Amino acid sequence: MTYCLRIADIPTNERPRERLMTHGPKVLATAELIAILLGTGQGPGKLSAVGLGQYLLQELGKNQRDPLAVLREVTPAELMQIPGIGPAKATSILAAVELGKRTFQFRPLDKTPIDSPVAAVAALSQDLMWQNQERFAVLLLDVKNRLLGTQVITIGTATETLASPREIFREIIRQGATRTIVAHNHPSGNVEPSPEDIELTRQLLAGAQLLGIPLLDHLILGNGNHQSLREITTLWNDYPQGD
């Protein structure tokens, strides 16, 4: 696709909107998705909407940054510093970004059973999934694994959070939960557990055994990804929870 052409000059079957209607959004390049939001082009060299979308990504990706990571937190003023992006285009982009975030912020209805990592992630997403700082949170459950609530225990830096078993269990007991799932986020989006994550999980499982409050899982979330430590470790075999 030629980025200097107007959308009207591109063959119909190659235009982003028509390709989305025919093949679905997954086949479109990121610049094409942005082009649909922009509607029109311009900027340096009178770019097409697709060209302007590509140029925007290049500008956001300067200094070896991930352009999509920058886009998630960009401000209107920052977008409008890019040639060709005025208030109308900036607000369209930011509205789409916010809508995308909110689709990950669905919370189950009260008393919904949490019967899978996916259900737990849905309940925790608003607190953890897109945060810039590491957070540690708990899902508070009743004896039938029904959701009583969520609670953020600690907020750390961009690279670490501090959570102790004492703080975690104190909140669980205070809230009257009889079962729990713990979770934290990795702002980088890499949801592989660190040695510290494994050790904390070990301590929590041992504490849960002593208190008789089953720990059902430890989840790591970040940038749309998640990982269940129960699914990828043998810790629950070492510390059975009676669940």
Curated annotation (Swiss-Prot):
Zn(2+) binds at residues 184, 186, 197. One of its GO terms (biological process) is DNA repair. InterPro entries: Hlx-hairpin-Hlx_DNA-bd_motif (IPR003583), MPN (IPR037518), RadC_JAB (IPR025657), UPF0758 (IPR001405), UPF0758_CS (IPR020891), UPF0758_N (IPR046778). Keywords: Hydrolase, Metal-binding, Metalloprotease, Protease, Zinc. A motif (JAMM motif) lies at residues 184-197. Residues 113-235 form the MPN domain. Gene3D superfamilies: Cytidine Deaminase, domain 2 (3.40.140.10). GO terms for molecular function: DNA binding; metal ion binding; metallopeptidase activity. SMART domains: HhH1. Belongs to the UPF0758 family. This is UPF0758 protein alr2351. It comes from Nostoc sp. (strain PCC 7120 / SAG 25.82 / UTEX 2576).
